[in-house]
């Protein structure tokens, strides 16, 4: 058997790092319970919303998808959506992409979170401020009337909650149509403000994006991008963000590169 080159071994290791990230649910259409979730995400230590029955599997011509049901009058993943975090081998640059489809009756309300990326030993969401050592996070976020932004916790933030980097105000997310999300993060040199954040959203012939090239994600070289944040829920920190009616969204074709 021929020996693999060093470059080939690096590629093999990189491929194995992503192997734990499923592109779509493996099971048949129907309920997606904790057992099915564990089979797809065996390395995740916790979840919100799965055991409560807010996830299911649906089939589309392009493949299986996760369906998340958002509870009316509720915010956050523990009561009104779902969340889990999947670790992967740390990198200085990562691209996350997936397809999301909002239900025909989707209630944007004031806004809510979509799956994103994070890194570091701490939890930098929910008002827990990033300091360049404890970690960072960035998640796409829908806003009222279907506008959209990247919502980032980073070392350059000046308040406890994250900063909003908005797409053009004229942009509107559609309901009942596939939307392609592409989120790119490149970490800064620890002594420079040269990090990258790029969010690109496409549906049909419509594309919108926001880019920031002076992000300070970290202050230590050991901090790297190493988490997929599969989090989606309405909120916001009070019930004014809660949907007034039941609605859902589908997620599929999940990729890291």
Predicted regions and their residues:
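Bacterial N-terminal signal peptides that target proteins for export
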Residues: 1-8
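Hydrophobic h-region of N-terminal signal peptides that target proteins for export
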Residues: 10-19
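Low-complexity, Ser/Thr/Pro/Gly-rich disordered linker/stalk regions
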Residues: 20-257
């Amino acid at each position: 058997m021929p020996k693999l080159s060093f470059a080939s071994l690096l590629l093999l290791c990189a491929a194995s790092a992503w192997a734990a990230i499923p592109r779509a649910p493996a099971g048949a259409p129907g309920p997606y319970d904790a057992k099915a979730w564990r089979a797809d995400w065996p390395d995740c230590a916790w979840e919100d919303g799965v055991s409560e029955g807010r996830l299911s599997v649906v089939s589309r011509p392009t493949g299986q998808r996760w369906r998340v049901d958002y509870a009316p009058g509720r915010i956050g993943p523990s009561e009104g959506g779902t969340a889990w975090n999947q670790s992967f081998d740390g990198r200085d640059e990562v691209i996350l992409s997936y397809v999301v489809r909002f239900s025909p009756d989707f209630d944007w309300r004031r806004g809510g979170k979509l799956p994103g990326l994070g890194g570091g030993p701490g939890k930098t969401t929910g008002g827990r401020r990033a300091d360049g050592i404890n970690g960072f996070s960035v998640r796409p976020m829908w806003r009222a009337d279907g506008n959209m932004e990247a919502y980032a916790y980073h070392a350059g933030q000046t308040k406890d909650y994250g900063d909003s980097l908005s797409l053009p105000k004229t942009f509107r997310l559609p309901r009942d149509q596939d939307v392609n999300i592409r989120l790119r993060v490149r970490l800064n040199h620890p002594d420079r403000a040269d990090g990258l954040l790029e969010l690109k959203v496409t549906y049909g012939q419509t594309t919108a994006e926001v880019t920031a090239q002076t992000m300070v994600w970290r202050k230590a070289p050991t901090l790297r991008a190493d988490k997929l944040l599969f989090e989606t829920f309405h909120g916001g920190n009070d019930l004014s963000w809660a949907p007034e009616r039941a609605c859902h969204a589908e997620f599929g074709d999940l990729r890291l590169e």
